[in-house]
Amino acid sequence: MIMRTSWVASRKGQSNVSQMYFARREVITEEMSFVAKKENLPESLIMEEVARGRMIIPANINHLNLEPMAIGIASSCKVNANIGASPNASDVNEELKKLHLAVKYGADTVMDLSTGGVNLDEVRTAIIQASPVPIGTVPVYQALESVHGSIEKLSEEDFLHIIEKHCQQGVDYQTIHAGLLIEHLPKVKGRLTGIVSRGGGILAQWMLYHHKQNPLFTRFDDICEIFKRYDCSFSLGDSLRPGCLHDASDEAQLAELKTLGELTQRAWKHDVQVMVEGPGHVPMDQIEFNVRKQMEDCLEAPFYVLGPLVTDIAPGYDHITSAIGAAMAGWYGTAMLCYVTPKEHLGLPNPEDVREGLIAYKIAAHAADIARHRSGARDRDDELSRARYAFDWNKQFELSLDPERAREYHDETLPADIYKQAEFCSMCGPKHCPMQTKITDKDLENLESILSSKGAKEINTMKLDKEV
């Protein structure tokens, strides 16, 4: 039997089954207990953080094969991987391949951002059924696809219908672009890259055509009613995130952020879980401000950022430009990092791009956990360092974030098994590796005794005499 089947059986049909609902009534759910063990934290702390809104456990009651996880400042920094088909590329099997690779290389959640080229319901259902990690979606994509791309035919009910369909299928969190208001649109004037959010762009077009307020904002309470029946979490979308350094931290971005804070509180009144999405493209000196501002405006709801990229001049290497910003954002308190692949701004990622992007972001998240002094975060680093000093090559590979890549690079020049016991690699060769110089603690203790008995002046004189 699938693990969560018995957990959720008694909840089905209730008006509110969210983790926040139970936490606020001091009920520790099976999901909270599972997360507590995973994070090595007390169950009571998990319950308190979920109740407070500083942590979410995205766990739709219809996603039965899910292994619950937590997103929040009290837990380890998480990484999301985006996959999804486009009208020009990919199919269901390709997306499942990307999913399996993402999970293999440590994705904590996966978003299906399919926009076309496949049956969207088919690919989403296949991904959810195959995924042990939470699945997120952006429902406005399918809402537009359902009316064949015709903004003028897209109604408020179309949005709500698709949102509930995703909940029924088992989606654990949905990006809802409810913070973009019609009065925010003029603030985009003067930007270099305008609106770069696909979902935000769709809603901006809808508002410009209909001259009405954002339907996801006006119907927000209706969406909350849907979400709490399935325990689907909000990922409040940042439609006005900056798409370049020039636009970072501008009036448009901050106006939307203020609205996202208000929506966070509205969702919490329904006991619905919320995280808030963030930029984007941000210079390094503005990253701390962006994280602190989100925490202030959104009352410490978990922050989920895309990057941010710290420079705009490296197409093909944006997994690197963004991992730099992601590590900093994680250090300052961001709860989840959305990966960027080398294909960002250039094309649809293939499976190898997924691997490259994910490893870059696992590095960033791990570095953030170390910088935040999270308990045990550095244990694996220390263990690998001991293996490195002992020339235990197989142990080094095993402890690596990407064992296959580490082994592959080592074996390019020294492939034979005998070199797995060698006290060198091809960088220094057999005679020049500094780690071969095994200076023991006993050696250093003896040196300390000599230094203390002779004194600095005598040691320096001895050195000069030797040089002469």
Curated annotation (Swiss-Prot):
GO terms for molecular function: 4 iron, 4 sulfur cluster binding; carbon-carbon lyase activity; zinc ion binding. One of its GO terms (biological process) is thiamine biosynthetic process. [4Fe-4S] cluster binds at C425, C428, C433. Its EC number is 4.1.99.17. Zn(2+) binds at H281, H345. GO terms for cellular component: cytosol. Substrate binds at N82, M111, Y141, H177, S197, R198, G199, D238, S239, L240, R241, E277, Y304. Binds 1 [4Fe-4S] cluster per subunit. The cluster is coordinated with 3 cysteines and an exchangeable S-adenosyl-L-methionine. Catalyzes the synthesis of the hydroxymethylpyrimidine phosphate (HMP-P) moiety of thiamine from aminoimidazole ribotide (AIR) in a radical S-adenosyl-L-methionine (SAM)-dependent reaction. This is Phosphomethylpyrimidine synthase.
